[in-house]
C-alpha cells in the first residue's frame, strides 16, 4: 500500500449564517452552508417559502435575451 496518498483530515466547523452549528472532520477547516437540518422545513415540521432563484432564473437574469438572440 502507498503511504501518504490520502488527504489530511482536520477539525471542520460547519457555519450557517455566521454561527458554528456543527463540528466534524474534513479536508477543509470551514464549510459555509445555506441550509442545514436544524432549520430545514422537512426536519423542523414548519412550512415556509424558500426564496431562492433556480439555475435557469440566474442564467436569464445574468445574460437575458442577449444569449437567446445569438443562438438564432
UniProtKB/Swiss-Prot annotation:
The keyword Cytoplasm does not apply. Part of the 50S ribosomal subunit. Keywords: Ribonucleoprotein, Ribosomal protein, RNA-binding, rRNA-binding. HAMAP family: Ribosomal_bL31_1 (MF_00501). The keyword Amino-acid biosynthesis does not apply. Binds the 23S rRNA. Belongs to the bacterial ribosomal protein bL31 family. Type A subfamily. One of its GO terms (molecular function) is rRNA binding. It comes from Deinococcus deserti (strain DSM 17065 / CIP 109153 / LMG 22923 / VCD115). This is Large ribosomal subunit protein bL31. It comes from the Bacteria. GO terms for biological process: translation. One of its GO terms (cellular component) is ribonucleoprotein complex. NCBIfam families: L31, PRK00528.1.
Amino acid at each position: 500500500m502507498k503511504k501518504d496518498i490520502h488527504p489530511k483530515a482536520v477539525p471542520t466547523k460547519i457555519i450557517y449564517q455566521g454561527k458554528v452549528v456543527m463540528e466534524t472532520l474534513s479536508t477543509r477547516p470551514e464549510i459555509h452552508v445555506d441550509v442545514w437540518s436544524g432549520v430545514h422545513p422537512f426536519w423542523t415540521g414548519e412550512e415556509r417559502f424558500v426564496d431562492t432563484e433556480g439555475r435557469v432564473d440566474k442564467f436569464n437574469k445574468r445574460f437575458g435575451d442577449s444569449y437567446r438572440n445569438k443562438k438564432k
